[in-house]
Curated annotation (Swiss-Prot):
Homodimer. Its EC number is 4.1.1.37. It is found in: Cytoplasm. InterPro entries: UROD/MetE-like_sf (IPR038071), Uroporphyrinogen_deCO2ase_HemE (IPR006361), Uroporphyrinogen_deCOase (IPR000257). One of its GO terms (molecular function) is uroporphyrinogen decarboxylase activity. It comes from Parasynechococcus marenigrum (strain WH8102). This is Uroporphyrinogen decarboxylase. One of its GO terms (cellular component) is cytoplasm. GO terms for biological process: protoporphyrinogen IX biosynthetic process. SUPFAM superfamilies: UROD/MetE-like.
Length: 352
């Protein structure tokens, strides 16, 4: 147990820490003027996320501004797709667009195994530079999309409100979908191993759209592939803390705990205390302040952080939002979130 390691890494491993570490999902992004200025200069999202100099600069922007306890790679969950033979783009205000949606077994059979060091060397370069730059002041986080969510994008071809296309595949051609999900699980595990070998100290898997599944369908189409990713990564990197996030996860919290992850990232629609009562004690939590609260006053932000941390006291907890910070959030309120999070123990007393 070494206090020379970053606070977030120590907390994620379950060590006793003086306060909960704090970072924000999407902490590098449109709410920051410095990011918007750079976006105006480089309007292509793929260029910003795949040019190592730009990705590194953007990843470091919130660290320079707020000194969070975690610095996460600026990238996208779809970044590994071209390495498997699936082209995509991200259109401003429209979101991801898949050039040729996956709808047939021939397309699935044609997918390539992912070799991250060949198809995404820029990711490894950025993670290594981040690790060197932040030292022990912050933990470096890597991330991926989970198989179900990646499949939802590549089958639908874009973001969806009701996921009718992939659900039709799930219920009419389940063998096709299972083969696609299995391919993604193998590839995503390889990608996470590459991220860890390159410098990521903690990793998070986003299954953003698994909350659209019934509990029974979560057990069939999401959880087994989440678990496969976790199992494969833990075979080679057993000491790297693994976080799982699902938007709208209140109905499947107990199921998430069976996937082998170390920490469950909660959205804001479940009470922190109630969530902890439903989860085994060895499972840590991350979250879960409503990102909409950051449109409020600094006092309101502080009060909600205090309530969240007070309810999580005595458990492994990483303070975060329950979703990514929203575009248009006042930048000074992002600063207030970090400031209040770092000073929470001064207001509520000891964390342990």
């Amino acid at each position: 147990m070494s206090d020379t390691l970053p606070l977030l890494l120590r907390a994620a491993r379950g060590e006793a820490v003086e306060r909960p570490p704090v970072w924000m999902m999407r902490q590098a992004g449109r709410y920051m003027k410095i990011y918007r200025d750079l976006r105006d200069k480089y309007p292509s999202f793929r260029e910003r996320s795949e040019n190592p100099d730009l990705s590194y600069e953007i990843s470091m922007q919130p660290f320079h501004a707020f000194k969070p306890d975690g610095v996460i790679l600026f990238s996208d969950i779809l970044t590994p797709l071209p390495g498997m033979g699936i082209d995509f783009d991200i259109i401003e205000s429209k979101g991801p667009q898949i050039g040729d949606p996956i709808r047939s077994m021939d397309q699935v059979n044609a997918l390539r195994p992912l070799n991250p060091s060949e198809s995404m060397p820029f990711v490894g370069e950025v993670l290594g530079r981040l690790r060197e730059s932040v030292g022990n002041e912050a933990a470096v986080l890597g991330f991926v999309g989970a198989p179900w969510t990646l499949a939802a994008y590549v089958v639908e071809g874009k973001s969806s409100k009701n996921y009718a296309v992939i659900k039709a595949m799930a219920f009419r051609e389940p063998e096709l979908l299972h083969k696609l999900l299995d391919h993604f699980a193998e590839s995503i595990a390889n990608y996470l191993r590459f991220q860890i070998d390159s410098g990521a100290q903690v990793v998070q898997m986003f299954d953003s759209w698994a909350g659209q599944l019934s509990p029974a369908d979560y057990d069939t189409f999401a959880a087994p592939y989440q678990k496969k990713v976790v199992d494969l990564v833990k075979q080679t990197h057993p000491d790297t803390p693994f976080i799982l996030y699902i938007s709208g996860s209140a109905g499947v919290l107990e199921r998430m705990a069976t996937t082998g992850v170390d920490i469950i990232s909660l959205d804001w629609t479940v009470d922190m205390g109630e969530a902890l009562a439903r989860l085994p004690e060895h499972i840590g939590v991350q979250g879960n302040v409503d990102p909409g609260l950051l449109f409020g006053t600094p006092d309101a932000i502080e009060a909600r952080i205090d309530d969240c941390v007070r309810k999580a006291r005595g458990r492994k907890h990483i303070l975060n939002l329950g979703h990514g910070i929203l575009p248009g959030t006042p930048e000074e309120n992002g600063a207030a979130f970090f400031r209040s999070g770092k000073s929470v123990i001064d207001r509520i007393g000891a964390f342990a």
